[in-house]
Amino acid sequence: MIPPSGAREDSGDGLTGEATGTEQPPSPASTSSLESKLQKLKRSLSFKTKSLRSKSADNFFPRTNSDVKPQADLLAKASPGPSPIAIPGSPASMPTKAGLHPGSNSKLHAFQEHVFKKPTFCDVCNHMIVGTHAKHGLRCGACKMSIHHKCADGLAPQRCMGKLPKGFRRYYSSPLLIHEQFGCIKEVMPIACGNKVDPVYEALRFGTSLAQRTKKGGSGSGSDSPPRTSTSELVDVPEEADGPGDGSDMRTRSNSVFTYPENGMDDFRDQMKTTNHQGPLSKDPLQMNTYVALYRFIPQENEDLEMRPGDMITLLEDSNEDWWKGKIQDRVGFFPANFVQRVEEHEKIYRCVRTFIGCKDQGQITLKENQICVTSEEEQDGFIRVLSGKKRGLVPLDVLVDV
């Protein structure tokens, strides 16, 4: 029996309603699009997790549930929008390992057989891992800890730190190592030094600062000559004597410098004068400061002192290492320190009349014509030992004349 058309339409509508009421199976296109969205979410979550782990040092300690919750909240805020439908059994719907195993980072070492190609030291006994044919040993696959086979039995259970992130090794390890390296020095220095200052160190430091100050003052005027402010203080100060009779006097004088309160810079000219008059062997300060010019010096500035070979110079100031202040008769000025030679009381000054080329193997030196030299020795077999600047050796006496 054929049902009427109205009934057929009603039944058709009922079937349509039933079909819409029941859940239709997803199409392959919708399933693939859903899987692609899940893969994108997984990649983004893994990238964010790696970036967060590389910037933090909390991975070295076991995290608890309270530590995992802020990270989950941070990831939820970082990816706003409608969350995709979770498919049962998919990786996104599975709980994280940190939530299930809060102490997963505290696993033990996983040692494996390893052949070491480079020289490696055992982390337990600190001896090199060697072998007859190959350097066999044990190595942890995660933290790369290397030990001997014999050291594995006596090794206590230790927590494996895992593989260090590159960002942590780069930004955190070096400062920690530097602080640990110099930590013992920081502890020892206050105990060793204290508040006591060595007087010798104070005097040397003050002399260095004074020399630098004079150099700066001389460079400002266009020449390396030191200023004339301290010349009056150093006129009467002699240099150290080389004679045997003045050894104790000079030693007492040098030791007394550090007993003055202001780094030994008090006025001690009176003491120098009294010391020079003690005993018959004391030398004249003027004779102690006598120099002879070795070369000719043409003045470059108004304050420079013109010199010719053989001129006798009285030293007035030697605070600067390169430029000294001296006096020739009634002329006063600055001259290079390496252009003069000191003359003692018992020394003689000679001039070379012709060029002499000496043999170094025989202890001789070369002298040019009109070169000045100083000696305190006597003639031996026609030769005499002279001193000219930094050169010292034998020259024949017939090429020298007195100045």
UniProtKB/Swiss-Prot annotation:
Q: Where is the composition biased (Low complexity)?
A: 222-232
Q: Which UniProt keywords apply?
A: Cell membrane, Cytoplasm, Membrane, Metal-binding, Repeat, SH3 domain, Zinc, Zinc-finger
Please tell me where this protein is predominantly located: cytoplasm
Zinc finger boundaries on the chain: Phorbol-ester/DAG-type: 108-160
The family database entries (SMART domains) matched by this protein are listed as: C1, SH3
Polar residues bias locations: 19-36
Q: Which residues form the SH3 domain?
A: 286-345, 348-403
The GO cellular component terms are: cytoplasmic side of plasma membrane; cytosol; T-tubule
What is its subcellular localisation? Cytoplasm, Cytosol; Cell membrane; Cell membrane, Sarcolemma
N-terminal signal peptide:
none
- The keyword NAD is assigned to this record: no
Q: Where is this region: Disordered?
A: 1-51, 212-264
Annotated GO biological process = cellular response to heat; muscle contraction; positive regulation of cation channel activity; positive regulation of protein localization to plasma membrane; positive regulation of voltage-gated calcium channel activity
Tissue pattern of expression reads:
Expressed predominantly in brain Detected in brain neurons, more specifically in hippocampus, cerebellum and inferior olive. Highly expressed in urinary bladder, and detected at lower levels in adrenal gland. Detected at very low levels in heart, liver, lung and kidney.
Q: Where is the composition biased (Basic residues)?
A: 39-51
Instruction: Give the matching InterPro entries.
Output: C1-like_sf, PE/DAG-bd, SH3-like_dom_sf, SH3_domain, STAC1/2/3, STAC1_SH3
Top-rank taxon? Eukaryota
Q: How does it assemble?
A: Interacts (via SH3 domains) with CACNA1S. Interacts with CACNA1H. Interacts with CACNA1C.
Record's function text: Promotes expression of the ion channel CACNA1H at the cell membrane, and thereby contributes to the regulation of channel activity. Plays a minor and redundant role in promoting the expression of calcium channel CACNA1S at the cell membrane, and thereby contributes to increased channel activity. Slows the rate of calcium-mediated inactivation of CACNA1C calcium channel activity.
Name of the molecule in the record: SH3 and cysteine-rich domain-containing protein
**What is the gene name?**
Stac
